[in-house]
């Protein structure tokens, strides 16, 4: 009675169909029905899932509240079947609860929407998510950073092609259905536990189921706090390594259990034989076993959903630069290292979870074996059922571990293939970089060659500009020379002026001669008059002396008579007349002196004119001398050209009987003939100009400026004919004769000028 009053919930549910089935199974021992989840457990589990959906990791909830939830649900009959209408014979192992018909609304969906996993670590960079529930991602801000990097991130080409594991579609059915292994259940299962839970390569995600109105929607677990027994710290900003690393979201513990609660649940009671505490502990153990079984089912569903991924997420390889390829390779290596660290941490977490499962099973075994008699049969039956289900789950877990190990091997093979491809890509990048460097060197050499060519062209341009400047200066000097050259009218005027000046010069010379003769005559007359003046002066002196003597005599002989006075008066008159004559002669001498001065001035002017004429004649003589030297040089050059022409003609005559010359030599000979013809024409023009200037004629301006008539191009083909060569020789001989005539005329003119200069000097 005490036990019945202490567990009223068990008694109240005795009339339920689940309790009837249990009593029937205990009495008959032939049929077993799978347990069903109680309503209180479902409400508690929905509360846990709501906490998980909100992104909270049971931090705000206290351990006492969770413990009260567990203790309040301990009175409910937790040994009720999940599928109440499925019977399994005793001779076989109990099948999994996931093996029910897919037509049930509560069963897991077979499509990829049953478990919607977002991409881990790539939601920000790639912006791709599975077409599932985006609300779970939005509700938890740390999900995008806490998603696990899948092992097959490196594709076939060594780049990030596919972010989902490449599992065939034929394994999808294997993930969804479970085969019942043919093994019998026993009470002692430590060896099976050690063999099945000792594999550290187990990888699985344990999403938190969220009950809705008609079906259970499985969502991703949020970040949890530090798991009991592990050194990993789960933060909201993403998995940061603490002491033993981070854990993926699928391997986190249930959000409804905190650290204190799990330690309270799994630790043995200090007084196991107290009936009230044993009942609470058994209820918590049963609830924990239900949680483990549900997590295993969810793991199987999750793995079945993970095996089906579309292949349309594999992006094509972009055509990038070598530097971008190198950065991509470095980032891929970094991601592979991070994935290896995550795999190691997941293995550690799996081993810790296996250890916890072993401890929980040992506690359950100890609690069930140490339970007093009132619930012995029911507990033994329930324990056998749980052991059968546990063996089945262990077999499924072994199959899963084998499949995951095979998948790991495939991923390692893909990783090795991707590493080989990365190595090939690196080698190709090295080759391309070498090619680019070689091409860069070639381009630099080309640029240097072009720079040299440009510098040479600049130098040539500078030389040509200097030559053009010199030519421009030459043209300016020629223009000045042409401007200074007199025209025909100016030349005629200058010749007329020269003739007039020569006539004036002759007239002035004649006048000078006349004036010189007149001057000589006047000088002679002046001399005679001076002699006369001297004689007159002497006579005057004699007369003055005689006068004095006469005066003396007069004084002595005043009284000698009047005859003497008459004589004196006559002599005085004679002296006056002589004095007047002398004055007249002096005036005439002054006039003659002034005339001589004017004649001297005119002679000085005439001498200046003669000096200017002499200088002009000297200039003309120097110009004639320069022309003679130029004509001599031209004659020498003409002689050399004639000799060269003759030698070339002889060579051509010698080469014609033998073999015909090459086209290059023929072209050169043709060009030489053309140059000789142009030189011959220039020499003829110079000779004509010099002869015209020597003869006093006006030169031909067209010849002086070098303006030639254009030669007909047909004459270039006739240079090799003997008639043309003979005619050219005659022209050269005529030119030589003209040069000789010019030389003789220049020498005659020079001799004449020299004679005139000597006569004038």
From Swiss-Prot:
Pfam families: CC4_CEP85. GO terms for molecular function: identical protein binding. Residues 333-656, 723-749 form a coiled coil. Signal peptide: none annotated. InterPro entries: Cep85/Cep85L (IPR040210). Keywords: Chromosome partition, Coiled coil, Cytoplasm, Cytoskeleton, Nucleus, Phosphoprotein. The modification Phosphoserine is found at residues 16, 140. Residues 435-454, 462-472 have a biased composition (Basic and acidic residues). Belongs to the CEP85 family. Homodimer. Interacts with STIL (via N-terminus); this interaction is essential for robust PLK4 activation and efficient centriole assembly and for PLK4-dependent cell migration. Interacts with PLK4; required for CEP85 to be able to drive centriole duplication and cell migration. This is Centrosomal protein of 85 kDa. It comes from Mus musculus. The gene is Cep85.
């Amino acid at each position: 009675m005490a036990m019945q009053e202490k567990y009223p919930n068990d008694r109240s549910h005795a009339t339920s169909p689940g309790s009837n089935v249990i009593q029937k199974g205990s009495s008959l021992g032939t049929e077993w029905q799978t347990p069903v989840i109680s309503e209180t457990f479902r409400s508690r589990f929905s509360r846990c899932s709501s906490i998980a959906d909100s992104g909270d990791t049971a931090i705000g909830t206290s351990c006492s509240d969770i413990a009260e939830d567990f203790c309040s649900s301990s009175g409910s009959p937790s040994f009720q079947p999940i599928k109440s209408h499925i019977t399994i014979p005793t001779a076989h192992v109990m099948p999994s609860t996931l093996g029910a018909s897919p037509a049930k609304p509560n069963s897991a969906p077979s499509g990829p929407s049953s478990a919607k996993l977002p991409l881990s670590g790539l939601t920000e960079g790639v912006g791709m998510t599975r077409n599932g529930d985006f609300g779970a991602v939005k509700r938890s801000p740390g999900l995008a950073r806490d998603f696990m990097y899948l092992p097959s991130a490196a594709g076939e080409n060594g780049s990030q092609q596919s972010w989902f594991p490449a599992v065939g579609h034929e394994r999808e059915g294997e993930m969804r259905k479970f085969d019942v292994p043919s093994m019998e259940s026993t009470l002692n299962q430590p060896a099976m536990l050690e063999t099945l839970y000792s594999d550290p390569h187990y990888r699985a995600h344990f999403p938190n189921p969220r009950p809705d109105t008609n079906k259970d929607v499985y969502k991703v677990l949020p970040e949890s706090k530090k798991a009991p027994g592990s050194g990993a710290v789960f933060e909201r900003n993403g998995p940061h390594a603490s002491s033993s690393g981070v854990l993926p979201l699928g391997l986190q513990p249930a959000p409804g259990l905190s650290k204190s609660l799990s330690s309270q649940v799994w630790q043995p009671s200090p007084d196991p034989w107290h009936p009230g505490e044993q009942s609470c502990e058994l209820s918590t153990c049963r609830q924990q076993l239900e949680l483990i079984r549900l997590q295993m089912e969810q793991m199987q569903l999750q793995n079945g959903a993970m095996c089906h991924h579309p292949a349309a997420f594999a992006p094509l390889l972009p055509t990038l630069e070598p530097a971008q390829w190198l950065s991509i390779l470095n980032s891929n290596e970094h991601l592979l290292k991070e994935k290896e660290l995550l795999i190691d941490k997941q293995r550690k977490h799996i081993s810790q979870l296996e250890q916890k499962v072993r401890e929980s099973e040992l506690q359950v075994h100890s609690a069930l074996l140490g339970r007093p008699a009132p619930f012995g049969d029911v507990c033994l039956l329930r324990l056998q059922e749980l052991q059968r289900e546990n063996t089945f789950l262990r077999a499924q877990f072994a199959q899963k571990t084998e499949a995951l190990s095979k998948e790991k091997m495939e991923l390692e093979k893909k990783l090795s293939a991707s590493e080989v491809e990365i190595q090939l890509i690196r080698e190709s990048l090295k080759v391309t970089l070498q090619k680019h460097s070689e091409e860069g060197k070639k381009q630099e050499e080309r640029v240097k060659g072009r720079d040299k060519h440009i510098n040479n062209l600049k130098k040539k341009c500078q030389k040509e500009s200097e030559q053009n400047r010199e030519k421009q200066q030459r043209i300016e000097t020629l223009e000045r020379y042409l401007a200074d050259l007199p025209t025909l009218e100016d030349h005629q005027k200058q010749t007329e002026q020269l003739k007039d000046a020569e006539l004036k010069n002759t007239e002035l010379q004649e006048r000078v001669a006349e004036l010189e003769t007149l001057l000589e005559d006047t000088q002679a007359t002046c001399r005679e008059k001076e002699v006369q003046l001297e004689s007159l002066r002497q006579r005057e002196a004699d007369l003055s002396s005689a006068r004095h003597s006469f005066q003396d005599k007069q004084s002595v002989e005043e009284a000698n008579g009047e005859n003497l006075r008459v004589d004196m008066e006559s002599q005085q008159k004679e002296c006056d007349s002589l004095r007047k004559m002398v004055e007249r002669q002096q005036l005439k001498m002054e006039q003659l002196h002034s005339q001589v001065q004017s004649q001297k001035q005119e002679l000085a002017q005439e001498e200046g004119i003669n000096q200017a004429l002499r200088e002009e004649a000297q200039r003309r003589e120097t110009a004639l001398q320069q022309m003679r030297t130029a004509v001599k040089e031209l004659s020498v050059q003409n002689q050399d050209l004639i000799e060269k022409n003759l030698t070339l003609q002889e060579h051509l005559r010698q080469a014609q009987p033998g073999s015909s010359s090459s086209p290059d030599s023929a072209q050169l000979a043709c060009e030489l003939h053309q140059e000789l013809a142009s030189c011959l024409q220039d020499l003829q023009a110079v000779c004509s100009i010099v002869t015209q200037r020597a003869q006093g004629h006006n030169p031909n301006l067209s010849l002086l400026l070098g303006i030639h008539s254009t030669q007909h191009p047909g004459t270039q083909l006739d240079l090799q004919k003997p008639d043309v060569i003979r005619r050219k020789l005659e022209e050269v001989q005529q030119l030589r004769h003209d040069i000789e005539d010019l030389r003789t005329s220049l020498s005659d003119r020079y001799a004449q000028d020299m004679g005139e200069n000597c006569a004038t000097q």
